[in-house]
Each structure stands twice: as C-alpha cells, then as structure tokens.
From Swiss-Prot:
Cell compartment(s), UniProt: Cell inner membrane
Transmembrane segments: 45-65, 107-127, 133-153, 162-182, 209-229, 232-252
Gene name, Swiss-Prot/TrEMBL: atpB
Organism taxonomic ancestry: Bacteria, Pseudomonadati, Pseudomonadota, Alphaproteobacteria, Rhodobacterales
Protein name: ATP synthase subunit a
Family: Belongs to the ATPase A chain family.
Tagged with keyword Transmembrane helix: yes
Organism: Cereibacter sphaeroides (strain ATCC 17025 / ATH 2.4.3) (Rhodobacter sphaeroides)
Coiled-coil stretches noted in the UniProt entry, renumbered to this chain: none
Gene Ontology molecular function, alphabetical: proton-transporting ATP synthase activity, rotational mechanism
Amino acid sequence: METEVEHTGLAIHPMDQFIVRKLFCHTESASPMNECTTNIHWYDITNVTMWMAIAVLVIAAILVLGTRRRAIVPSRSQSVAELLYGFIHNMVEEVTGHEGVKYFPYVMTLFLFVLCGNVLGLLPLSFTTTSHMAVTVPLALMVFVGVTALGFMRNGPGFLKMFWVTSAPLAIRPVLAVIEVISYFVRPVSHSIRLAGNMMAGHAVIKVIAGFASIAVVSPVVVGAVTAIYALELLVAVVQAYVFTILTCVYLRDAVGDAHH
C-alpha cells in the first residue's frame, strides 16, 4: 500500500506537521496513516493534548514567577507579567468600557492561551495546536455562547435591538436586520478560521521552502528565506493572538454596552 508521502512524491510533506497522533500507540507501521493517527477517541492523549497542557504550564509559570516576589523595582519576570496585565487590561477597558473590565480575567486567559499556542508551535519538533479547528472552534464558540448569554442576561429581549439598525431608512431596516443576524451567527466561524488558517498557512510555507535546502546551489538562499519567514511567523503569532482577543472584546462590547446601533 502506498503511503501518503509516496503518493504525493514528496520526501517531507508540508502538511504532515499538522497530523494529530496518539502519544501512546503500539504499532510498527511507518505509514503516516497508521493506528497512531486513526481511531482516535476523545479519551486518547494526543500531541494536541500535550502541547495545550504545555501552554497552560507556561502561562502558569509566567504568572507565578512574575507575582511571587513583587517589588517596587520589578524583576524581569515581574516586568513581563505586569506588561501583559497592563496591555490586556487597557485593551479591555478601551474597547468594552468600564462595564467590561470585570470580564478581564477571561480575556487575558484567552489571550495568553492563544499566544502560547502560537509561539510554542514555532519551536522545533513542536505542534501548533491553534492550527487545528478542533482547538479554535471551541474557543470561538465559548466566546459566542458567553457573549450571547451575557447579552440576554443584561439586556433581556432588548439585546435583539442590536439587529435593528435605527439609523437606516425604515424601508431597508428588515433587510439589514437579516444581514445583521446572519453576520452575528457567522462570527464564531470567521473567529476560528482566521486563527487556524493563518497559523497553518505560515507553517506550511516554511516547510515547503525548507524542503529545497537539500539542493546545494540554492541552500544559502533557502536558509535566509526560512529565517526571514520564521521571524515573520513570530510576528504573525503575536498579531493573531491580539486579533483573536480584540475581536472577543468587540463582541463583548455588544453584550455589556448599549445594544442600539
């Protein structure tokens, strides 16, 4: 039976890095489509599970080390923790207003988790958890369901007024209302696909270009290109975490702020 690599003719397939594998698997098959990558159940510990756990441990380490010995003259770890705290706190307050600050802990947790998932994926032999819809969709759905529930809890049926554009002419308001409802329910789709798509695309490009490094004539150029793209991917990792978080704040503003357009 031909393996996936043999079928495509590539020595290293750029998408192999995104295959979910069980950590504890007994098989002698060298095929990428073996028992380790099939028949995965919800209780199996996979590479996704492991790297999400590592991300949580990294977040805990940053916050614990940064707040363990607080001083007027902050240490490096305290400076990092205070920088992250101040950055996210200001973002939440500026976007959602004073009423949204009470939800700052959730927003900061979300930002740190996405950021660590993105950055850890750049380490050699690691796994980018945020490149999988199985990770980004639940994150986006938690935001969507939470914001919707909060909106009805705070505003009651008045939360639905956000779909009725009062600034538009009366004749086209029903049409705009339908568009607003559709765009509202599309939020978790765009919220999750944006993050997963950007993280997957960048890593795939790096793998494709790195595949030419075995050609001696172009290897110096390839190494330089991979280094440049790698630096760009580090920036993308931070930017995508920021975009995911600020969109969460924008959606949160609909629930805690005025629901009228």
